[in-house]
Amino acid sequence: MATHDLTNALDALSVTQHKHAINGIKRGIERESLRIKSDGVISAQKHPEGVGSALTNGQITTDFSESLLEFITPVSESSTQTLQQLKDLQKFTLEKMGDELLWPISMPCFIEHQDDIVIAQFGSSNVGQMKTLYREGLKNRYGSMMQAIAGVHFNISFPDSLWQSLHTLKNSDLSLEDFISDGYLALIRNFKRELWLISYLFGASPALCSSFLQGRKTDLPFKKLGKGTLYLEVGTALRLGNLGYTNSAQSSLRVMYNSLDEYVAGLKKSINTPSDIYGNLDDYTSENPKQLNKNILQIENEFYSPIRPKRNAKNGETPTDALLRAGIEYVEIRALDVNPFSEVGIDIEQFHFLDVFLTYCLLKSSPAMDWEEQTRSTENLDTVVNKGREKGLELNYFNQPRTLQSWGEDIFSQLSEVAKYMDTAYGVSYYSSTIERMATWINNPGLTYSGRYVAELEASGLDNGHYALAIAEKYKQSHQAADYQVFSKQWLEEQVTRSNDAQRAIEQSDSVSFTAFLNAYFDPK
């Protein structure tokens, strides 16, 4: 049963003049994937020349390391087209990689030592050197192994027509820009409250190779499989836990989401406050720098969060300055594991679910969220990460115990109402059918991605690494056999040439030293 506020919002939007206000949701995907050799070992080769410059190619770049590819789709209103673009980008890249493969899961394997992970290189320009030094700082702060974890980022923006309708229906006194920013922050707060559901449904990293731990001790109740596989029998997403990407080293950062000014102030404090932990590492002012600077965060991107408010920044503009200039433009969901059951790392049912879930997060009442509630939400996520498929599991629901099943059923009953509204607006039926199908996963944890993964891993009798390697080989063959669907090979080759030309132009146009460049970046006059 939908809550009163959600029902009212859906009823108001369902009248004729607002009926199609939701039409025009835009999305973009960033999918990360490690390049591996044919034996599964992480590649030590440079970024493939055939895909152009990692600095300036807008579709194919690198993340932390030379071997961690990132595929970026343009913004689109068509989920199907976005998936086709991802296929084209990965097919094209595989053609330039020789006998190398794309790792099909989030957690890395077959890495003997973190020094085997080569930090991404972006050329000799000041901006390229800054990107590499930032990554050097990440290595020295958190270790390279954590940075080798891959994920999928789902970017979404709602159409102006929806914001205008909501602004009218709520009789808001705010400017439309401020109203939109407040709306996205309301979405973010609700997303954080029920983030555990994303981990339960789509978490796909319940297993890892023991080499990932690099000798670190852990209290997690791992079961062993084969020579070196560790897995949580009822876990969901190790990537999102304390072993993974949302590193506990940042747990003391108090970034809040109740207003744009509050969010920006929290981040700016972190990038301007000297760190007690990293102060002994030389920064860019030294002859042999190990990090950009000695602050709690080197730059804003270092803040690990499962969701971020975003605005496209102008040249030389920081992310928070862009937000202050013109408000929130879209949100970036960073909580998705690579989907091992999809050759591109995400599939259409996830698009449909996230459309509904994020619309629900936007339309549902979203009270202010204090630090205690943020902490509670993080603890719920940790619980689901480590034992989300445990029968009768209890979560903390406003300081009262509530079973995951009860809470999940309640959420899905509300998602069902949102899905009906969206189906009517779009003239489709897939939103309702997706929600109806996934609702059955709440009481059948074996249907979740992590449940399926553990079952197939156990049935295969293989180590996690060899199981993933077999998937990688299958997906490479599938990409090779496929035709280009949206991007032509010629267009992709043109982007390679343009990116190489653009990198050269940037390098030739630099007129100040690297130190002077960073002085200006960190202390703009």
Curated annotation (Swiss-Prot):
Q: What domain of life?
A: Bacteria
The pathway this protein participates in, as annotated, is: Sulfur metabolism; glutathione biosynthesis; glutathione from L-cysteine and L-glutamate: step 1/2
Catalysed reaction, written as an equation: L-cysteine + L-glutamate + ATP = gamma-L-glutamyl-L-cysteine + ADP + phosphate + H(+)
- Keywords assigned by UniProt, alphabetized: ATP-binding, Glutathione biosynthesis, Ligase, Nucleotide-binding
Task: Tell me which Gene Ontology terms the entry assigns under biological process.
Answer: glutathione biosynthetic process
Record GO cellular component, one term: cytosol
User: EC number(s) per UniProt?
Assistant: 6.3.2.2
A Pfam family of the record is Glu_cys_ligase
| Molecular functions (GO terms) | ATP binding; glutamate-cysteine ligase activity; metal ion binding
Gene3D superfamilies attached here? 3.30.590.20
Q: Top-level EC class, please?
A: ligase
InterPro entries hit by this protein: Gln_synth/guanido_kin_cat_dom, Glu_cys_ligase, Glut_cys_ligase
> Does the entry feature the keyword ATP-binding, yes or no?
yes
NCBIfam families named among the record's database cross-references: glu_cys_ligase (TIGR01434)
Regarding protein family, the annotation reads:
Belongs to the glutamate--cysteine ligase type 1 family. Type 1 subfamily.
Q: What is this protein called?
A: Glutamate--cysteine ligase
> Which organism does this record belong to?
Pseudoalteromonas translucida (strain TAC 125)
What is the taxonomic lineage of the source species?
Bacteria, Pseudomonadati, Pseudomonadota, Gammaproteobacteria, Alteromonadales
